[in-house]
């Protein structure tokens, strides 16, 4: 899906920093294995990773920082399941907006901390 989006953007006339970047390089490195890494950090199977945005923001920040330090040009927010239906399963359906906002703020802080241009993409699940 990301490759398709990059192909479409390369053909366009947009001038955003992101489009300028993808037009100037052959490839961009993205993050991966977010769930696996969160399990390694203590997330339990069945838990909602999005709740960690508020409960353990330092762990989410470390996850993103490690991704950037490893060379990622783009990384996703910790918000894939941050919607009312998914969070309702954990009795936090009313916190979807707040948790999504926190995930974006944590990610943006880490991207801005980098000494190079790093892009943050919102992760939106079903």
Q: Where are these predicted regions, by residue range?
A:
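Domain-level signal for soluble alpha/beta catalytic cores
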Residues: 3-126
């Amino acid at each position: 899906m990301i490759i398709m989006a990059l192909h479409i953007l390369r053909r366009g006339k947009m001038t955003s920093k992101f489009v300028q970047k993808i037009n100037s390089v052959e490839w961009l490195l993205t993050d991966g294995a977010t769930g696996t890494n969160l399990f390694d950090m203590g997330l339990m199977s069945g838990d909602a990773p999005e709740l960690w945005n508020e409960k353990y923001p330092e762990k989410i920040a470390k996850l993103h920082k490690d991704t950037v330090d490893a060379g990622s040009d783009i990384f996703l927010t910790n918000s894939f399941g941050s919607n009312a239906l998914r969070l309702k399963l954990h009795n936090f359906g009313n916190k979807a907006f707040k948790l999504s906002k926190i995930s974006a703020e944590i990610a943006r802080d880490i991207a801005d901390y980098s000494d190079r241009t790093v892009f943050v993409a919102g992760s939106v699940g079903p």
